[in-house]
Amino acid sequence: MLNLSAEQRPRLRQPIVAVLGHVDHGKTTLLDKIRGTVVALKEPGQITQHIGASLVPTDVIEKVTEPLKKIIPTVKLELPGLLFIDTPGHEIFSNLRRRGGAVADLAILVVDLNEGFQPQTYEAVEILKQRRVPFVVAANKIDRIPGWRSYPDQPFLISYRKQSEEVRERLDNKIYEIMGELAKLGFDSERFDRITNFTRQIAIVPISAKTGEGIPELLAVLAGLAQRYMKGRLKYVEGPAKGVIMEVKEEPGYGSTIDTIIYDGIIRQGDTIVVGGIEGPIVTKVRALLVPAPLTEMRATKRFEPVEEVSAAAGVKIVAPGLEKAVAGAPVYVVDSPEKLEELKEQVKREVEEVMIETDKEGVIVKADTLGTLEALVQFLKNRGIPVRMARVGPVTKRDIVEAMTVKSKNKEYGVILAFNVKVLPEAKELAEKEGIKIFQHNVIYRLIEEFEEWLKALREEEKRKVLETLVRPGKIRILPGFVFRRSDPAIVGVEVLGGVIKPKYPLMKEDGSRVGSILQIQDKGQSVPEARAGQQVAISIKGRVMVGRHIHEGDVLYTDVPAEHAKLWLTKFKNELSDDEKFVLQEIIKIKRKQNPLYGVVLPSPSS
């Protein structure tokens, strides 16, 4: 709301609405359609322009939803309208942050009916959950349902009634699929016209952003929800403005500016403001408040026009000195008295520091382009049990590589850098390559985490494989009568593997637990083999002070001599790596060993448990 006198100001502000969803599911088309509707139904001079947002005024909502009055009861609107954030997607949504939640009051989750839930849909739902933002599902592209006949700009319910039984069934099945996906994520949902309680169920509105079908219901559901359940949150506040930076931009003739969404109160030209910056709070004075020049402006060169004041909810460009280090996703507060300045500086500092993590613990290094995306990324990692040592805004620097090296020296798994939508500085890249520090870079959060998790899984498998190769596996063999090829130095005998596994270098013991050398080589049909398993008959050479006929005899049963520490690992960390017959042989080995050492293979509880 821009430049309104006190009498003109309504009692409620417009709800701020964000649009999220998977790539190519129709977010931008939907916003374009909504904007186009406003332009078509308003006199050009009456359109209030915002920076980074589009206002759909109440009179436009009423005109669009007029045909619905014949079908469903509609609410008398007290809201001044709906303020849509122009840039869709969860990167911008992440920046619409405030302490303990989001600046957005409502969200539209756009889902392509024909494709259903996709990776970024799940990511969007997770962010909406994190920020506790109520949302409506726009089930888009109904015009793509085979056999659908389009009725441009009509309410969905009118179009739906004109479709064949078969087409309606196809649509309903697609909606049930979306309901199923939402149920898996813990949400009860239903088609909007079948909902009895909007606080308990998520409304699914079938639409076509292309033809405009269903847009009347979508606007009606959003406005109705906001008015019915959010009046407390939307109360108009006269006090000093609170806002959030969506983008920091260099503008010719103005220098560094911040595109800001004001969600509370009023901001005026000349006000002192405190802004969140990378290096701490920035205190500055508003030189100008800019909004886009009206579309009717004759001189096309004039992109912005100044206004004296702006009140919530609004999108505005703030021009002020010293904004170069301001960071998107950080708060903007108007200082209404000198006494409040220190308090607000402290508040801004706290808010930024809550997101910019710096600890000594082992964990990954996270870099992102804005405070909002950093916060979302850290939350995603925490939800997946991945610890974070440091989280900062900005490019990957040499210092980040040094931090990762410190972590890597203690824990290979987390000595890495996750970089979202930021560059890696040349000297950082050089050091990372030299020190073998892995940098994951992506501009889609879920892909960034996915790539890291895939790498981590492969690393853990490789580490596990290396450890497993050093462990002696349980094995049991019998010396075959009549198959003694050499009695000693080394003894060579034919054996049958009765259970488990034998490999070269494995020590052997008798049934009384006494050691009888170790396996030098295994041969099957004259060929050396790396191992032999249960059921195989092979020739083995045994090195050590062992002679067939004196220390061991034909028909003897021998076991692999599993060291006590190895037995503990087989019983705990690697128990799922043993086959059933190996587990059985291990129990026999434990029984033999405990006659000599009662604590063999005993797993003692750790002090912390």
UniProtKB/Swiss-Prot annotation:
Pfam families: GTP_EFTU, GTP_EFTU_D4, IF-2
Stored InterPro entries: EFTU-type (IPR029459), P-loop_NTPase (IPR027417), Small_GTP-bd (IPR005225), T_Tr_GTP-bd_dom (IPR000795), TF_aIF-2_arc (IPR004544), TIF_IF2 (IPR015760), TIF_IF2_dom3 (IPR023115), TIF_IF2_dom3_sf (IPR036925)
Region (G4): 140-143
Keywords tagged on the record: GTP-binding, Initiation factor, Nucleotide-binding, Protein biosynthesis
Any one Gene Ontology molecular-function term assigned to this protein's record: GTP binding
Start and end residues of each stretch annotated as G2: 46-50
Domain tr-type G: 12-230
Region G1: start-end pairs: 21-28
Spans traversing the lipid bilayer: none
PROSITE patterns assigned to the protein according to its UniProt record, in alphabetical order: G_TR_2 (PS51722)
A cellular-component GO term for this protein: cytoplasm
Region (G5): 208-210
Gene3D superfamilies according to UniProt: P-loop containing nucleotide triphosphate hydrolases (3.40.50.300), Translation factors (2.40.30.10), Translation initiation factor IF- 2, domain 3 (3.40.50.10050)
Domain of life according to the entry: Archaea
Binding positions (GTP): 21-28, 86-90, 140-143
Chain residue ranges for the region called G3: 86-89
HAMAP family from the UniProt entry: IF_2_A
Family: Belongs to the TRAFAC class translation factor GTPase superfamily. Classic translation factor GTPase family. IF-2 subfamily.
Function text: Function in general translation initiation by promoting the binding of the formylmethionine-tRNA to ribosomes. Seems to function along with eIF-2.
Protein name: Probable translation initiation factor IF-2
Organism annotation: Ignicoccus hospitalis (strain KIN4/I / DSM 18386 / JCM 14125)
